[in-house]
Amino acid sequence: MGPRIGPAGEVPQVPDKETKATMGTENTPGGKASPDPQDVRPSVFHNIKLFVLCHSLLQLAQLMISGYLKSSISTVEKRFGLSSQTSGLLASFNEVGNTALIVFVSYFGSRVHRPRMIGYGAILVALAGLLMTLPHFISEPYRYDNTSPEDMPQDFKASLCLPTTSAPASAPSNGNCSSYTETQHLSVVGIMFVAQTLLGVGGVPIQPFGISYIDDFAHNSNSPLYLGILFAVTMMGPGLAFGLGSLMLRLYVDINQMPEGGISLTIKDPRWVGAWWLGFLIAAGAVALAAIPYFFFPKEMPKEKRELQFRRKVLAVTDSPARKGKDSPSKQSPGESTKKQDGLVQIAPNLTVIQFIKVFPRVLLQTLRHPIFLLVVLSQVCLSSMAAGMATFLPKFLERQFSITASYANLLIGCLSFPSVIVGIVVGGVLVKRLHLGPVGCGALCLLGMLLCLFFSLPLFFIGCSSHQIAGITHQTSAHPGLELSPSCMEACSCPLDGFNPVCDPSTRVEYITPCHAGCSSWVVQDALDNSQVFYTNCSCVVEGNPVLAGSCDSTCSHLVVPFLLLVSLGSALACLTHTPSFMLILRGVKKEDKTLAVGIQFMFLRILAWMPSPVIHGSAIDTTCVHWALSCGRRAVCRYYNNDLLRNRFIGLQFFFKTGSVICFALVLAVLRQQDKEARTKESRSSPAVEQQLLVSGPGKKPEDSRV
């Protein structure tokens, strides 16, 4: 048997010089005693603090590349004609490969070189990020109207009300789609699904191996702080992803193949598509660089010196013969595949893959019988469902609800929401360490944080903008006759059914899908100092024939986006107070040998019950609020207009539902912990008089038989 970290109460051994030379590939030769730690001169990589730093940077880069898709989800929808349900499914495919392997990799992590496995996974994540950009390079240039973007005057003319004989030729319509066009669409979408799956597979070893590695070799009192720092730095990844998305989406999607005459779109145009693919290249490079140090960390490293000194001081007064006998690994017979300790089941470390598959269902069921483990995981499932839906669709929600650009929405989220998440995680970790919170204290902190989060979520139902009037869609034709989608005023026009070039009547604040649907037959460009403004004139369907302005109507309540996001950020910070204490409830509730497996089971449930279904659930709910769909080759593509009031109620309502579930679970956790604490004190008070009486009978120099206090 090679050197291993023993149960609580044993001093960990340090590999000898021969083993150190081959560390990570071979175990220590059986029977050889390890030298004292000061006899070994460890390299700079034999430092758990350095590992915490490197792992924080890697998880930051990993979440940056996975979070970048969420920052550009609405842009990808417009570029490839996807519904919110499909884009939510695309985002959740990150978890498919991860879920299929997480438990097995977590268990067999005790046999492999964990840092190197983390490095290999990071390399796969970087390659998946590069694959994610491939659809951009194999697709045709983006067409934002029925004409080529290389001819701006033709672009303006294509949307005018013109007789059928003089109308410009349109691009392939819904009834004129070739099989090649549909096949190409399916191919590029399929590539993105494969890339997302590989992204999840590569991330399998990163978090569970890193958490268990830190908790194995860090001082017990430092572990909460280290994990708090790890999670806090990690959460900067999505924040950087949204900041990167804000920059990239200000660039036109085909920046690498811009036409000579430029384009007629501006960033405020609803047809604008930013360079979503460019951020994946940058994030993939960051992950590849962060993976390099992991190939130099050892398989095992000595515990921190404070841990060794602490154990030497307390071993003599806390380790009873009964405890040593209970924790001794020699108590397990060679044929046993599992053993029960402290309510959880530990799998023997010498199982084969087939044996592991056979014994895992029983281990899983017995693990879930532990009430604290089950309730904490269920509460984290609710929190993760809320976080997955919010992270995936909050940028799109802000765009639609407050009529702001995708770039500005990402900037606000990156500057407000994610810093608050970091603050919440750090404060939670510091409170656990400074207050020396035990299980009951951790449970109380989790419940308090979620109750406050739920309270500050109530005003979100009432902060938002109603949908502006759209002729023929949301406009009441009974109040204003002649403004339906195909009125008699535009019968002579040859308006494309699938056209989309919105214009706004400033006097009535009514929006039309195209200038043709407003009956406009001409256009003018007014040059200004900073930009040019396009007006469409001679509009037969507009009241008094007023000119209409190119672009959607501006929202009258866009200023509410900042108060809305401040409340969201405050709720996120309060919810993240529970992050570190809930993890400590799981890590401190299992044996050291069970930690990797317990974390693996935890993440398996989070992915199966939260990160996989939640984006699809939120996307489906968003799709039900759509009032006008774009069509592509006869199929429903991207949504162009939503019912904003219904969108707000359903999106925030889902968030409120998951927060309520988390509050209920944490309340049950606290109740169970208090009951267990009460029973333990009662048992201790009852057993103390019996022990004292037995000591008097046995004499001062004898110990009571079968004492397990």
UniProtKB/Swiss-Prot annotation:
Distribution of this protein across tissues and organs: Strongly expressed in the liver, at the sinusoidal membrane of the hepatocytes. Expressed in the kidney. Expressed in placental trophoblasts and syncytiotrophoblast. Expressed in the small intestine. Expressed in the blood-brain barrier, in endothelial cells of brain capillaries. Expressed in the retina, in the inner nuclear layer and the inner plexiform layer. Expressed in skelettal muscles. In testis, primarily localized to the basal membrane of Sertoli cells and weakly expressed within the tubules. Also expressed in pancreas, lung, heart, colon, ovary and spleen.
Annotated effect of mutating residue 611 to F: Decreased E1S transport; decreased cell surface expression
Disulfide pattern: 489-520, 495-516, 504-541
Variant or mutagenesis effect after changing residue 277 to F: Decreased E1S transport; decreased cell surface expression
UniProt note: pH dependence: Optimum pH is around 5.0 with estrone 3-sulfate, dehydroepiandrosterone sulfate and taurocholate as substrates. The high-affinity site for estrone 3-sulfate binding is pH-dependent with increased transport at lower pH, while the low-affinity site is pH-independent. Taurocholate is only transported at acidic pH.
Glycosylation sites per record: 176, 538
InterPro entries the record matches: Kazal_dom, MFS_trans_sf, OATP
Effect of residue 436 to Q: Decreased low-affinity transport of E1S; no change in high affinity transport of E1S
Effect caused by changing residue 59 to A: Decreased E1S transport, no change in cell surface expression; no change in Km value and decreased Vmax value for E1S transport activity. Decreased taurocholate transport
Listed result of changing residue 66 to A: Decreased E1S transport, no change in cell surface expression, increased Km value and decreased Vmax value for E1S transport activity. Decreased taurocholate transport
Family annotation (CDD domains): MFS_SLCO2B_OATP2B
Outcome reported for the amino acid change (mutating residue 56 to A): Decreased E1S transport
Site (Implicated in low-affinity site for E1S transport): 579
Molecular function as annotated in GO: bile acid transmembrane transporter activity; organic anion transmembrane transporter activity; prostaglandin transmembrane transporter activity; sodium-independent organic anion transmembrane transporter activity; transmembrane transporter activity
UniProt-annotated site: Essential for E1S and PGE2 transport activity and may interact with these substrates, residues: 607
Misc remark: Most likely contributes to the oral absorption and the disposition of a wide range of drugs in the intestine and the liver.
Protein name, per record: Solute carrier organic anion transporter family member 2B1
Organism field: Homo sapiens (Human)
Organism taxonomic ancestry: Eukaryota, Metazoa, Chordata, Craniata, Vertebrata
Gene: SLCO2B1
